[in-house]
Amino acid sequence: MNSQGSDRKAVTLLLLVMSNLLFCQNAHPLPICPGGNCQMPLQELFDRVIMLSHYIYMLSADMFIELDKQYAQDHEFIAKAISDCPTSSLATPEGKEEAQQVPPEVLLNLILSLVHSWNDPLFQLVTEVDGIHEASDAIISRAKEIGEQNKRLLEGIEKILGQAYPEAKGNEIYSVWSQFPSLQGVDEESRDLAIYNKVRCLRRDSHKVDNYLKLLRCRVVHNNNC
């Protein structure tokens, strides 16, 4: 095994261990707050959420690499598979400079919309991947893990929004996933094409979420001094 592969596995394992501590009050007790309304410091909350978002991105990237290996030489398949992601309907900023121009509370709601939009598609993806006989155990386990961790990420982002910008809660817009209907009863090629594109979109969106959260931490917690 090459050193790059070893490093990747080591980092993934570390993120898995650390993610189990996220939002765990037993491992990280929340500070005692007046009136019993306890909240952890915003910086710590950002740190935990970003650790989890990066973990999800790494899992989705690894899952896409596993799928891509199967079709790397089939250029016709890849050309057919790649289509617009349903979340493209969300007007998310392209690049750091554009994201810097978006008010923090608006960007947080966009992040929340992206993460929330994946809840049902991830549930479908787990079922679809689990039904593929040739799917590796690694792909199946990653799909299940991402589905579970996405719920926790959603919870963490909602906590950040509620603590930093409570007046902005409820302004998120969720995309409609009509392009990804159930794959039950479709032929094998159509199923594989749809799953490939769904995982590709998952990797793209999880990378966006991870980058946006890191940018927001710098702006909100460190006043752009990072």
Curated annotation (Swiss-Prot):
The gene is PRL. The keyword DNA-binding does not apply. It is found in: Secreted. Pfam families: Hormone_1 (PF00103). Gene3D superfamilies: 1.20.1250.10. Prolactin acts primarily on the mammary gland by promoting lactation. Residues 1-29 form the signal peptide. Its main location: secreted. GO terms for cellular component: extracellular space. InterPro entries: 4_helix_cytokine-like_core, Somatotropin/Prolactin, Somatotropin_CS. The modification Phosphoserine is found at S53, S117. Belongs to the somatotropin/prolactin family. GO terms for biological process: female pregnancy; lactation; positive regulation of cell population proliferation; positive regulation of lactation; positive regulation of receptor signaling pathway via JAK-STAT; response to nutrient levels. Disulfide bonds join C33-C38, C85-C201, C218-C226. It comes from Mesocricetus auratus (Golden hamster). This is Prolactin.
